[in-house]
Amino acid sequence: MARLQQFYKETIVSDLVKQFGYKSVMEVPRITKITLNMGVGEAVADKKVLENAVGDMQKIAGQKPVTTKARKSIAGFKIRDGYPIGCMVTLRGPRMFEFLDRLVTIALPRVRDFRGISGKGFDGQGNYNMGVKEQIIFPEIEYDKIDALRGMNISITTTAKTDAEAKALLVAFKFPFKN
């Protein structure tokens, strides 16, 4: 069992029951999945760029990402319907908790000029979205072997009904929010 998963079961659940007054432990919000998405616009000109992005994402997530394809043609961007333009991976279970652990304890503190993550990334349904500007904050990526700095979106989907509950859950997981 992952370290954060055990921490969730042993301490976070009881803390949130006290804080929000849930009648059952099954009402306590939990993280269902984490989705990593990397849009690679340069893949239109060079297919090698997408292969490198997929390799980076695989090292970061620990599982093989799926390539995302363009849904419709856009002449201005020289994209045709069905072109591979990015990659994404969905993490659940123990892998999700391991990634969350690495994100909070190792990767986020390595961001340049880091003062905490924004509290404005909640969507109203208790999910949190954040962006990472460069993939080198993860220790799995070797600085010498990258061809370009690429960012990614990280979506954390929870069972929380409100943003306040979701924020309390993420704060319990030691997320470094600003202020």
Curated annotation (Swiss-Prot):
Family statement: Belongs to the universal ribosomal protein uL5 family.
Task performed by this protein: This is one of the proteins that bind and probably mediate the attachment of the 5S RNA into the large ribosomal subunit, where it forms part of the central protuberance. In the 70S ribosome it contacts protein S13 of the 30S subunit (bridge B1b), connecting the 2 subunits; this bridge is implicated in subunit movement. Contacts the P site tRNA; the 5S rRNA and some of its associated proteins might help stabilize positioning of ribosome-bound tRNAs.
Domain of life (superkingdom): Bacteria
Species per Swiss-Prot/TrEMBL record: Dechloromonas aromatica (strain RCB)
Molecular-function annotations in GO: rRNA binding; structural constituent of ribosome; tRNA binding
Gene3D superfamilies: 3.30.1440.10
GO CC annotations, alphabetized: ribonucleoprotein complex; ribosome
Assembly information from the UniProt record: Part of the 50S ribosomal subunit; part of the 5S rRNA/L5/L18/L25 subcomplex. Contacts the 5S rRNA and the P site tRNA. Forms a bridge to the 30S subunit in the 70S ribosome.
Biological processes annotated in GO: translation
InterPro entries (alphabetical): Ribosomal_uL5, Ribosomal_uL5_bac-type, Ribosomal_uL5_C, Ribosomal_uL5_CS, Ribosomal_uL5_dom_sf, Ribosomal_uL5_N
Disulphide bridges, residue numbers: none
Protein name: Large ribosomal subunit protein uL5
Keyword terms of this UniProt record: Ribonucleoprotein, Ribosomal protein, RNA-binding, rRNA-binding, tRNA-binding
Pfam families: Ribosomal_L5, Ribosomal_L5_C
